[in-house]
Amino acid sequence: SLTRIDVDTNAGVVSLNGTVESPEQRAQAEQIAKGVGGVKRVINNLQVQR
């Protein structure tokens, strides 16, 4: 698997960094992060592996 996601949090802001295999995985990771209690904002810096 080429998926590697690093998650950082600070005061309700979640930053997603790393690589995923598809645009769908990128969107899914963002949706999961948004669904976590206390999360106010998600910064999605995930790159899709080509």
Regions found by a protein language model. Name each.
Residues 1-50:
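N-terminal targeting leaders
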